[in-house]
UniProtKB/Swiss-Prot annotation:
Domain HTH myb-type: 321-381
Tissues expressing this chain: Expressed in roots, stems, leaves and flowers. Expressed in stems, anthers of young or mature flowers, pistil tips, glumes, vascular tissues of mature seeds, coleoptile and embryonic root of germinating seedlings, root vascular tissues, leaf veins and leaf sheaths, guard cells, and leaf tracheal elements.
Function: Probable transcription factor that regulates abaxial identity during leaf development. Modulates leaf rolling by regulating the programmed cell death (PCD) of abaxial mesophyll and sclerenchyma cells during leaf development.
Deletion phenotype: Rolled inward leaves like a cylinder at mature stage. Narrow, extremely rolled and dark-green leaves. Malformed spikelets with low seed sets. Slight delay in heading date. Disordered and irregular arrangement of chloroplast grana lamellae. Abnormal sclerenchymatous cell development in the abaxial cell layers, altered mesophyll cell distribution, increased amounts of chlorophyll, and enhanced photosynthesis. Altered seed morphology, and reduced root number and root length.
Record-annotated DNA-binding residue ranges: 352-377
Annotated InterPro entries: Homeodomain-like_sf, KAN_fam, Myb_dom_plants, SANT/Myb
UniProt keyword annotations, A-Z: Developmental protein, Differentiation, DNA-binding, Nucleus, Transcription, Transcription regulation
Biased composition (Gly residues): 119-128
Composition bias, Low complexity: 453-471
Designated name of the protein: Probable transcription factor RL9
Keyword Manganese: no
């Protein structure tokens, strides 16, 4: 019957942080399978190379003690070995393991099962002592039966598939290293939620299902560990069943496979997960895991959990910034805009914020005013006569003109520019830019009488649209007969404007005297509800 024993020796191992020598405890059964190793309370595989071949990279003449686990028989001491005062600690007084014999000892270990022989003497001397390791005689049959029964009870527990936990009960989680908590998952498999047992109820929050993937990347001393538990089982604690999955993961064959695959456990699960996220190169996870693992240990063992997660998570498309809603610059709204600009000292001195505050129109945003002012400056700085509308918002594309409350017809043959009552001195000045001062004064509406000027763009057969780009010239609709405006004074501006007014843009004198300043941001029922 195999018996699990504890071997304590000095180990020499190295990683990216350098070479280290630590006293290490190894749990070995009588068949030579190394179950786990412990280094100062942190589980690690160190550099105990291939215990199945019977070799270990421990220091020559190290202080090696052998003792059984708590599930075995009581610990007893016997006489010393030849020339070195060796101490043999065994279970039931008949331990088959023995200490190295001083400075002349060999580093070879014989991990074969102990023979079942009759009881013999203890102490050094004799021909059998010429070997550095020799098998002590087994205890009497009664002691063998007791020890074997205890070992059998310990080896039957792995069928329960429970992780090796410190003390077998609800223990405190391992202390964080440099302020970084250590995440431990049973079996070392990533993306597996551990079953809630009595041992991990107290620290269930440490077993995050996604953090099992990064459980062995928090400290250099845990590399390249594949063991499932963070603490060694103390000799005085109750026995904990050994997980056969943990024994397989800690075997040298599995460590060799893990090293070949970038030392990432469960690479098939990782590959499938990455492939589902659409990560390129997910079919070769060893390259990704190995490269990042090496990069992690070159930087002092600090965790790269966030960086690793960001590499595996899909890139979310950047959300477009919220833009102002679509709107139509009616002639009334534009007249109010021009009036505000003139009050601020002209288009060169006016700012979008000041114009917005001076206009005081509901639902008008700074983006609307800014783009409209930009186009207004563009028109004022050119020699072309300008149209009567401006851009709707900062980058929303083409917009329709809607002049004077009428819908822009399919031919786009009518656009209306109405001056606001009480201050419409600049309504026609915007449309009459480029003309002389006298002509502009003749065509402008003064005082509080209010005015209405319609420009019919004859020959413009397409729907009146324009682009927001400041490079595009404004559509000029100067085909309206302006001779009537030049030949008459300010006495009857409305009568002389009648020939230019289209049939769909009839407005009342009451509306001209007190125009409505309400406007909508592209509501489909705006024309039919209020302005039919």
């Amino acid at each position: 019957m195999a018996m699990v024993r504890e071997l304590e020796l000095m180990t020499s191992w190295s990683n990216s942080m350098g070479r280290h020598r630590y006293p290490t405890r190894i749990l070995v059964d009588s068949f030579g399978h190394k179950c786990s190793a412990s280094d100062k309370g942190v589980w690690t595989s160190c550099s105990i190379r291939a215990p199945l071949q019977g070799r270990g990279s421990f220091r020559r003449g190290a202080n090696i003690r052998f003792g059984s686990l708590p599930s075995s028989a009581a610990v007893a001491t016997s006489g010393g070995g030849r020339g070195g005062g060796g101490v043999v600690v065994g279970g039931g007084g008949g331990d088959p393991w023995r200490r190295l014999d001083g400075s002349t000892a060999s580093t070879e270990l014989s991990l074969s099962p102990p023979p079942a022989q009759a009881a013999g003497g203890g102490g050094g001397g004799g021909g059998a002592d010429a070997l550095p390791w020799r098998h002590r005689p087994s205890p009497p049959s009664s002691a063998v039966a007791t020890t074997s029964a205890a070992a059998a009870a310990a080896l039957m527990a792995p069928m329960m598939l429970q992780p090796l936990d410190a003390g077998g009960g609800a223990s405190a989680p391992p202390p964080p290293i440099r302020g970084i908590p250590i995440y431990n998952g049973p079996g070392g498999f990533p993306f597996l939620q551990p079953s809630p047992t009595a041992g991990d109820v107290g620290h269930h929050h440490h077993h995050h299902p996604k953090m099992g993937f990064y459980s062995s990347y928090h400290h250099p001393s845990t590399w390249p560990s594949t063991s499932p538990s963070p603490l060694a089982a103390p000799p005085g604690a109750a026995s904990s069943p050994l997980d056969p999955t943990a024994a397989f993961l800690s075997s040298p064959h599995h460590r060799m496979l893990s090293a070949a695959s970038g030392r990432l456990n469960g690479m098939l699960s990782v590959s499938d997960t990455l492939r589902s996220y659409g990560v390129p190169g997910a079919a070769a996870p060893g390259v990704i895991g190995g490269a990042h693992h090496h990069h992690h240990h070159l930087h002092g063992g600090q965790p790269f959990v966030g960086a690793l997660a960001s590499r595996f998570m899909p890139k979310l498309p950047a959300k477009r910034s919220m833009r102002a809603p679509r709107m139509r610059w009616t002639s009334t709204l534009h007249a109010r805009f021009v009036h505000a600009v003139e009050l601020l000292g002209g288009h060169e001195r006016a700012t979008p914020k000041s114009v917005l505050e001076l206009m005081d129109v509901k639902d008008l945003t700074l983006a609307h005013v800014k783009s409209h002012l930009q186009m207004y400056r563009t028109v004022k700085s050119t020699d072309k006569p300008a149209a009567s509308s401006g851009p709707a918002d900062g980058g929303s594309g083409d917009e329709e003109f809607a002049g004077g409350g009428q819908a822009a017809s399919g031919g786009g043959d009518s656009m209306c520019l109405r001056g606001g009552g009480g201050g419409g001195v600049a309504a026609a000045a915007f449309a009459e830019h480029g003309r002389s001062a006298s002509e502009g004064a003749a065509s402008s509406v003064g005082g509080g009488g209010g005015g209405d000027m319609d420009q019919s763009s004859a020959g413009n057969t397409s729907t009146t649209r324009w682009s927001n780009s400041s490079r595009d010239p404004w559509l000029s609709s100067n085909s309206c007969n302006m001779d009537a405006h030049r030949s008459v004074g300010l006495s009857s501006p409305i009568e002389n404007l009648e020939p230019c007014r289209s049939s769909s843009s009839q407005v009342s004198n009451h509306e001209l005297s007190s125009p409505s300043l309400e406007f909508t941001l592209g509501r489909p029922d705006w024309h039919g509800a209020d302005h039919d």
